[in-house]
């Protein structure tokens, strides 16, 4: 819905039809990414991020303070609370702030996804779509005669189509462009 109504998308120069097509293509790439990693690579980082975010989310039901500490607090300390230690021990990347950021976002998305990985993919693809459209808008200024080529390049290039659509760092990196 946001893609068809938000001026950031509608004023991009890409018609609504092609915006939705691009989003659908990216969704397919994101779903394929999750499926491939769950069936051929034993989950990989993408499923590990999701599973760890579920542990973070479930901490809310043990003690809401734990959840807020995990999602918004610093991870550069050693907790002394035994119950909290029990929660964070299985969470990978606890002390790696760069990777832990992905877990934080996924822990917040857990409230909307009800624990479904593919709902996270829908959000992640939207984040990635923001970057893809922003990149298109920027390139359009410099190359106004190549809009079709840019659309194909940005929505069908394998690295953007597949890697940029999964629940992983690449989608956020694309958004940050």
Regions found by a protein language model. Give the residues of each.
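Transmembrane alpha-helical segments of multipass membrane enzymes and assembly factors
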Residues: 10, 109-113, 134-148
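Loop-to-helix entry region of an early transmembrane alpha helix in multi-pass inner-membrane enzymes
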Residues: 92-104, 112-130
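Specific aromatic-rich, kink-prone transmembrane helix
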Residues: 134-137, 173-177
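Transmembrane and membrane-interface helices of multi-pass
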Residues: 150-157
